[in-house]
Amino acid sequence: MSKNDFNATINLPKTDFPMRAGLAKREPDMLRRWNDMDLYNEMLKKNDGKPRFSLHDGPPFSNGNIHMGHALNKALKDFIVRSYAMRGYYTPYIPGWDNHGMPIESAIIKEQKLNHKAMSIADFRSACHDYAQKYIDRQMDGFKRMGVVADWEHPYKTMNKGFEADRSEERR
């Protein structure tokens, strides 16, 4: 029996899926396709006017690259938001970042070896702002690469002027 005869006796499913994943090659095209189809806004449009489900994002600090804890956190939130969207809820999801406090200050002092005591408060705050924005951009890119569907164009950042005033107004 030749090899070709034997192959004809095996009943394998027919599929368009490639035999090799080739993720490094295919990932940019997948991400571009999801971006081009505006997946987040399409999901919102589909359920516009229906009951609302809001998941408030407890934000990560913007003081380093994403790690497994961030990945698990965002994957679970994405799963919850998508499952509510599939159940017919309007599900806006606004990602955010916490940019205040010691985690940012400690990270920038350590990483850039800053002598913050020799700097003016304004210069140190500006350096912290730039440092935080760098890691927001990196983390956002990582979350997008994970396929997290969110309003990436309008995230909240605790370092933005007016953020705290806006939160105070919401609580009234």
Which residues fall in each region the model found?
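N-terminal, positively charged nucleic-acid-binding surface of large information/translation enzymes
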Residues: 1-172
